[in-house]
Curated annotation (Swiss-Prot):
Originating species: Allorhizobium ampelinum (strain ATCC BAA-846 / DSM 112012 / S4)
Cofactor note: Binds 1 [4Fe-4S] cluster per subunit. The cluster is coordinated with 3 cysteines and an exchangeable S-adenosyl-L-methionine.
One Gene Ontology term of the molecular function aspect: zinc ion binding
Entry protein name: Phosphomethylpyrimidine synthase
Residue numbers binding [4Fe-4S] cluster: C558, C561, C566
Residues that hold Zn(2+) according to the record: H414, H478
One GO term describing the cellular component: cytosol
Enzyme class: lyase
Length: 610
């Protein structure tokens, strides 16, 4: 391990969320693992136990953790990886000027201070979670995931309500490590976990598990810095992002990515083609297999957990996009289409896919097979180009599986609501039930500035139908690079979509948090309502805009109805009177015409301006 010279360290957001604590559960098969979750404490008057929720925020919300961005996070998986005996350290490649877009001097982002020798598979070995699963091995990663996915299930076992529609998914009442192994072995789930990203807490992406969300970050040629991108990553996972994609397209790509990975407790994905293009000065026609191969190894050594590879864009499909309203909207897809047309030959990604698999299996980099021909408008949804590419992605999935590589499939895009289910059904059939990972989809094209909403609608639907991971869309989609606030809005929007899908699919214990918040709402436990919400800060601030005093936090009304017309307060009164007089007497009273509003006392009247 080498340590580079010191320099100013970027600052990131830390600290617990309101009324929350970080708790850890130990493994049974692998006692050394400690699975984090967030425990939300309720008000003593509730008489209810704390509510545990899935937590992807890493040590940044742990008050007992020491955060040192220039040192990176604890390498929790390092011993697990080495103990398997199938990896070897080596010197790795040297960083070249083109890795950082030829940035130099003051424009060059400093290297990450700590450098560990990269690992790779020993000759003839596959070090993927898929290879282990097929061999019948339950890895520590698999047990870690089982504990994570079971949050709330054991406590709620007797009261589990399974009234959802899962559209053929096989969601168990209780997730065992063996179930995780089976799903991975069958290719229906992936565990993105590069052996060179030991800081990552294991998670799973699959139709029979909780729906996950991804947040995109990354610099561009005109804006953002390393410090901003590291903070965006930390900020995104604070609010619930399960993975993060670094889509940087400007200078300093290598060094920025190193800072992100070393400080990320969630899997990091990339589109290697973007960096490869920077290495040839942005000229797509000058891309070569050698440049791309070198970029794959560079990123695999750093610890990238999944690659988006646009190998499904074939020369013969490009003409199918000519009459589209919006043509080819995928950056990677358009780059490869331009390359294919210029050279009039098949993409080097398609031609060298076997070799790409060999690289991925040596580091356990999962495939995210890119949808380079996805529709960029609802007018182009479900067209011949989109589904031709999907057929090729199905073929590539089989090739990758044959080499023990983990695979998920990327999906659209822009799709109106009535065409969404066809996408899910075709993907399951064509790609052998490999996990589906979709961008939205956006259900209408008329709302720039609000595309987190247009896409959130489609995301909830396709998540219900079976998509395993949803890629967030921010309000800045189609308009500009998202900032910190946009990242939060996108993450919260997609947490709503993913959770709504979990509820609709009938995931056990998915409703525990909803019911706890509903009881708090009915009992006017305002602090519990805020703390149980996905965004406690916003919920509290909206309430306090009109009722700011501490006394209002225990009031039995809000500013929507006021004390006189509060429906829940009226319901409390009806319930109390019903218990007192009996249901039959109450029914007779209200048939005769009784008052259905509460009298308000002078003490409860809000003063002017409150």
């Amino acid at each position: 391990m080498n340590i580079a010279p010191q320099f100013p360290t970027p600052e990131v957001t830390t600290g617990t969320l309101p009324a929350s604590a970080k708790v850890h559960i130990a493994g049974e098969i692998h006692p050394q693992i400690r699975v984090p979750m967030r425990q939300i404490t309720l008000h003593p008057t509730s008489g209810e136990p704390p509510v545990n929720v899935y937590d992807s925020s890493g040590p940044y919300t742990d008050p007992n953790a020491t955060i040192a961005i220039d040192a990176g996070l604890p390498r929790i998986r390092a011993e697990w990886v080495v103990a398997r005996g199938d990896v070897e350290p080596y010197a790795g490649r040297h960083v070249k000027p083109e890795d950082n877009g030829f940035a130099s001097g003051e424009k060059l982002t400093p290297e990450f201070p700590v450098r560990n020798a990269p690992l790779r598979a020993k000759p003839g070995q596959a070090v993927t979670q898929l290879a282990y699963a097929r061999a019948g091995i339950v890895t520590p990663e698999m047990e870690f995931i089982a504990i994570r996915e079971n949050i709330g299930r054991k406590a709620a076992k007797d009261a589990l309500i399974r009234d959802g529609e899962s559209f053929g998914a096989s969601i168990p009442d209780y997730v065992t490590p063996e179930f995780v192994r089976q799903e991975v072995a069958m290719g229906r789930a992936i565990i993105p976990a590069n052996i060179n990203h030991p800081e990552a807490e294991p998670m799973i992406i699959g139709r029979n598990f909780l729906v996950k969300i991804n947040a995109n970050i990354g610099n561009s040629a005109v804006t953002s810095s390393m410090a901003e991108e590291v903070e965006k990553m930390v900020w995104a996972i604070r609010w619930g992002a399960d993975t993060v994609m670094d889509l940087s397209t400007g200078r300093n790509i290598h060094n920025i990515r190193d800072w992100i990975i070393r400080n990320s407790p969630v899997p990091i994905g990339t589109v290697p083609l973007y960096q490869a293009l920077e290495k040839v000065h942005g000229i797509a026609e000058n891309l070569t297999w050698d440049v791309f191969r070198d970029t794959l190894i560079e990123q695999a050594e750093q610890g990238v957990d999944y690659f988006t590879i646009h190998a499904g864009v074939r020369l013969s499909y490009i003409h199918l996009t000519v009459n589209r309203v919006t043509g080819i909207v995928s950056r990677g897809g358009s780059i490869m289409a331009k390359w294919c047309l210029h050279h009039h030959k098949e993409s080097f990604l398609y031609e060298h896919f076997d070799e790409i698999c060999d690289i991925c299996r040596a580091y356990d980099v999962s495939f995210s097979l890119g949808d380079g021909l996805r529709p960029g408008s609802i007018a182009d949804a479900n067209d011949a180009a989109q589904f031709a590419e999907l057929e090729t992605l199905g073929e590539l999935t089989k090739i990758a599986w044959a080499k023990d590589c983990q695979v998920m499939i990327e999906g659209p895009g822009h799709v109106p609501m009535h065409k969404i289910k066809e996408n899910m059904d075709k993907q399951l059939k064509t790609c052998g039930e490999a996990p589906f990972y979709t961008l939205g989809p956006l259900t209408t094209d008329i709302a720039p500035g609000y595309d987190h909403i247009t896409s959130g609608i489609g995301a909830a639907m396709i998540g219900w139908y079976g998509t395993a991971m949803l890629c967030y869309v921010t309000p800045k989609e189609h308009l500009g690079l998202p900032d910190r606030n946009d990242v939060k809005t996108g993450v919260i929007t997609y947490k709503i979509a993913a959770h709504a899908a979990d509820l609709a699919k009938g995931h056990p214990a998915a409703q525990v948090r909803d019911d706890a918040l509903s009881r708090a709402r009915f009992e006017f436990r305002w602090e519990d309502q805020f703390n149980l919400s996905l965004d406690p800060d916003t919920a509290r601030s909206f309430h306090d805009e009109t009722l700011p005093k501490e006394a209002h936090k225990v009031a039995h009304f809000c500013s929507m109805c006021g004390p006189k017309f509060c429906s829940m307060r009226i319901s409390h009164d009806i319930r109390a009177e019903a218990q007192k007089e009996g249901l039959e007497a109450m029914a007779a009273k209200y048939r005769d015409g009784g008052d259905l509003y509460m009298p308000v006392s002078d003490e409860e009247k809000p003063s002017v301006g409150e």
